[in-house]
């Protein structure tokens, strides 16, 4: 049996899509959710900034053309990890979302 590696995230673009090597693109988005605050009662706002990579060249081109800052989107994809050397013999592990499907929400006038 294979492990499930799938994510669905909705949010707002905070850094416009930019081209990278090999006809790919990267963009940053912010997903906001509200959760109950057991200490103070009520709810609190939780913001989650994410870095999203698009590896499919045709989807990457569409993202570069259609993702200005402030646009709402829905991303379906998978998590991918990478180990980064920080210095002093330490490594830092980062996760990014690799988009397989991007839905552009309508721009409100």
Place the predicted regions along the sequence by residue.
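Single-stranded nucleic acid-binding surfaces, predominantly the OB-fold ssDNA-binding core
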Residues: 1-109
